[in-house]
Amino acid sequence: MIDHAKETAKETAKEAARALRRRYFPLQDSLIGMFGRLLRRSNLVREHIAAADPLKDSGRAAIYVHFDPDGQVDDYVVHQVSALADAGFRVTFVSNSPTLPHDSRARISAFCKDIIWRFNTGYDFGAYKDGIASISNLDRLDGLLLMNDSVYGPFRQLREVLSRLDGSTADFWGIADSFEYQHHIQTFFMFFFPAALQTPAFGRFWARLPYVNHKPWVIRNGEVGLSQRLYRAGLRSGVLAPYWSVAEKMKARLEDMKGNAPPQSQQPGFARFQSRILGNRAVNPMQYFWDILITDYGCPFIKRELIQLNPAGIPFLSRWRAVVASRSEYDTSMIERHLQRLDRRDGHDANPAVISP
């Protein structure tokens, strides 16, 4: 049997340690940012390639960020880029890969305005920065979407998802929001209305953002910092699945399980998972709430890292195929092929969540 009291005590101690570390983040981030600014470059573009540009007259632009250690463009990426074009976006494809062969470029060229191949300095936010800098009419756009390949999907038509956008109530919008560090919209899929694009705060944020190769810094100053900068400018955010609404649904599910615990609740890590949710700790919604997001909120994506690595030890993850199939006809073999290729490349055994139906 799992000792829930012991797991709760461990989680409380870990949270106290995390809170102590957070006290030093501002100083650490200031020093890292200062160093990044000393090495300031206008961009890190290796090559700018014209593509088919099938939507020349579209007023909506998308920056799609890609990384693959071998420079391959997998089927799930082609599916995403074509879905953006189908939804009316003029796509700039930005790859941080160490190489980008011609056959990879050819796979997505028909759906894109252009392709930017760059050095992987600054990670996704460095790529977003260079992609945005390539758009000459930014302040005249009807909307800008930032998206990256850290998710699988979409499991639904993006036009349907984006039909929920309402520029009268929000200036920028995303699939999920988070309270880790500070409140922010998660940037794997983030849309900006003209009110956001035209505010000086938006341009200043990207102009001043240094290229930094330190992932925690990029999360705190890129992902979190972007939303916080826009909030300070008086802009409003919207989201498909509001954090506390989703969290309350998960809490209700866990409370129900207390009286009728299924055998799976004895899985290692379940007590820790339960403690974090019922203790109202800020968690990553795309990991902790992944299934409710898909089934109850129509979330069209699942995080790649969740299936590949499951870093938070989320229980019941082997259900991911069934959950996706319950709401979509998405071809999950695209996910399996991609992750099995990476496992073979790295010489690892495939994650059971990938190979076990």
Where are the predicted features?
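ER/Golgi luminal nucleotide-sugar-dependent glycosyltransferases, focusing on the catalytic module
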Residues: I2-P357
